[in-house]
């Protein structure tokens, strides 16, 4: 437990130190965010805010891993791979947006191909590692499903879902950062309670790095995480849950991610089928914005909801074998 606390503090400080160094550099090289014209009017003033800020918490996390552990475990290495690999895809996407001076980087099929490649690599290594295998645990009922040959296709779909859902959540200052900070704290506790101490330390590191990044990303944001950050966070949330054999619990603790993704699916589906919109704008955080809610109120309420969902997540695991709080 003391190593977890130490890891949080180190990652937090490293993240804080990087802000004053990297943010001016992003300004200098004009790595500013292009705001989509169809977005909320209040977001227009954010145009030019530096993006790619996800590199702050990615670098902080990687540095801290090697500060606190000279020989990272297999689980830590796989989590770092997911974190960095998905982050690189986001970095490419962000770079193209800046080069083209538009809010469109990689084409949808290009991004999906890259996501599928990384997801396949992770799924293959997880499937062939005896400590992970092809089993997943079902929350509440505590039954184990062995997916066998369907495990890798499931993991590919799963990572496509988590990365895109977190990406959609990153639409307000501090929103994706706050939600994922809470989710990673949840996984740190679960990892510790199940004896996965290396993973517990890694989750603590990411949580600490996000806490430091929040100083620069909270309203009014000095920097956006960009796709660099949101895809990396979707990847690391997915990887940690996968290694705990708890990918299904993301549906519970990541309920905000799910709501954001579903709101887009429902909005698009309704408009194509009925010619009518369900929400004023999607993802759903924009609906609340256009309903008169301030960004900070939305972030606060969504964070409170996530705390409640994490408590429900703990309840769903209480009687699981090997789980002890």
UniProtKB/Swiss-Prot annotation:
Cofactor(s) annotated in UniProt: Mg(2+)
A Pfam match: MraY_sig1
GO biological process: cell division; cell wall organization; peptidoglycan biosynthetic process; regulation of cell shape
Pathway info: Cell wall biogenesis; peptidoglycan biosynthesis
Annotated EC: 2.7.8.13
Membrane topology: Multi-pass membrane protein
Top-level taxon in the UniProt lineage: Bacteria
Catalyzed reactions: UDP-N-acetyl-alpha-D-muramoyl-L-alanyl-gamma-D-glutamyl-meso-2,6-diaminopimeloyl-D-alanyl-D-alanine + di-trans,octa-cis-undecaprenyl phosphate = di-trans,octa-cis-undecaprenyl diphospho-N-acetyl-alpha-D-muramoyl-L-alanyl-D-glutamyl-meso-2,6-diaminopimeloyl-D-alanyl-D-alanine + UMP
A GO molecular function held by the record: metal ion binding
InterPro entries assigned to the protein according to its UniProt record, in alphabetical order: Glycosyl_transferase_4, PNAcMuramoyl-5peptid_Trfase, PNAcMuramoyl-5peptid_Trfase_CS
Subcellular location: Cell membrane
Primary residence: membrane
Any one annotated GO CC term: plasma membrane
Family to which this protein belongs: Belongs to the glycosyltransferase 4 family. MraY subfamily.
Protein role: Catalyzes the initial step of the lipid cycle reactions in the biosynthesis of the cell wall peptidoglycan: transfers peptidoglycan precursor phospho-MurNAc-pentapeptide from UDP-MurNAc-pentapeptide onto the lipid carrier undecaprenyl phosphate, yielding undecaprenyl-pyrophosphoryl-MurNAc-pentapeptide, known as lipid I.
Stated name of the protein: Phospho-N-acetylmuramoyl-pentapeptide-transferase
Organism: Clostridium novyi (strain NT)
